[in-house]
A protein has these predicted regions:
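Register-specific detector for alpha-helical tandem repeat solenoids, activating on a conserved position
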Residues: 7, 33, 59-60, 85, ...
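Structural signature of tandem-repeat unit edges
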Residues: 1-2, 11-29, 37-55, 65-81, ...
């Protein structure tokens, strides 16, 4: 697979409902960048089995896919620079994110990943303990149905913390800047999710 090989391949194919198979297990620079951007009727995404990913490989892959309700599984545990940047940005029908098991993360890897996913109600556990610059920057920004509180109440019963266990470290103040819309978020701090939200 060559660098940039499928960039913009189905850009604004508004009649595309089911994506083709993408069986590659080793990815390259920007290989799927904006591949399905603004495919407004896409409901069946491809499986994405690769555990060997590359810089910006899924960058904006499903940007503006407003009918997408199910996200593909993302099994990689070691990430690359900007690999998931804006991947589901503007997927307003998406309710649940995929689980994100990566323990080794990279610059900007989850930046803007779910930006503007207005119906998103789930958040993933994020187990990495060494954070990088912009890694979670605006990850859930404008996801208005995700609600966090600093206090445990009847309406906010579920603990949410980054990382779920242990202690995270970062040398960058922007690692989690703007991660959620409704309150400033800090690592190694327990917050509480609204009863309408779930952890995946």
């Amino acid at each position: 697979m060559a660098n940039y090989c499928f960039t913009y391949l189905f850009y604004r194919w508004t009649n595309l409902i089911t994506a083709p198979s993408l069986p590659a297990t080793t990815l390259t620079l920007r290989c799927y960048n904006r591949m399905f951007q603004e495919c407004s009727r896409l409901t069946n995404p491809p499986e994405l089995p690769s555990t060997s990913i590359a810089e910006s490989c899924y960058d904006m892959m499903f940007f503006g896919c407003t009918s997408l309700a199910t996200a593909p599984r993302l099994p990689a545990t070691t990430l690359a620079k900007n690999c998931y940047w804006g991947m589901f940005n503007g997927c307003t029908n998406l309710e649940l994110p995929p689980s994100l098991p990566a323990t080794t993360i990279a610059y900007g890897c989850y930046q803007n990943m779910f930006y503007g996913c207005a119906n998103l109600i789930g958040v993933p556990n994020l187990p990495a303990t060494t954070l990088q610059q912009y890694c979670y920057y605006r990850m859930f920004y404008n996801c208005q149905k995700i609600k966090l509180n600093t206090s445990n109440t009847v309406d906010y019963p579920t603990e949410y913390r980054i990382p779920p266990t242990g202690k995270a470290t970062t040398n960058y103040s922007n690692s989690v800047s703007g991660m959620f819309t409704n309150l400033p978020f800090n690592i190694n701090t327990t917050y509480y999710l609204h009863s309408s939200n779930v952890i995946v």
